[in-house]
């Protein structure tokens, strides 16, 4: 994951070294929570467990600073420069598509998938998330609980 696209909070819509990059430009540098969640899930599905966990934990940290509600988009400034996610001036909060992002992040962290009648649980948590639980998951398997815990040095 390059620092050009990863702000420390999520994935930018454009790399920071591109000529048109603008960290508060709607499609040219902002971070979109729903895009980042889809990217995290894709990384997880293709075996990039550590990178997916980094994206998920970073976005969940941003959500805490937005009072547990993710906006449509926020500025793509580097996390080390601002220490908090900078609001995009006209972003909707809440935004319908951003509300699903934390759920997909949790799915990526717990490695939840289905295989016919079975729920697959394959957690990969970053050290910043010690324990994660998702209870009473309905499906063809009936209802199940999923648990994950961080292990030092293992993702």
Each model region followed by its residue ranges:
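Beta-rich accessory regions
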Residues: 43-54, 115-155
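A generic alpha-helix propensity feature with a strong bias for hydrophobic helices
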Residues: 26, 36, 74, 81, ...
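Extended glycan-interaction surfaces of carbohydrate-active proteins
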Residues: 1-31, 64-87, 103-110, 136-145, ...
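Well-ordered alpha-helical segments within folded domains of soluble proteins
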Residues: 29-45, 92-107, 154
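Catalytic cores of secreted or luminal carbohydrate-active enzymes
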Residues: 91-133
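Generic preference for well-ordered secondary structure
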Residues: 23, 36, 85, 89-90, ...
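Acidic/polar loop patches that form or flank catalytic/metal-binding clefts of enzymes
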Residues: 7-9, 49-55, 66-72, 111-122
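Extended amphipathic alpha-helical segments enriched in small hydrophobics
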Residues: 30-67
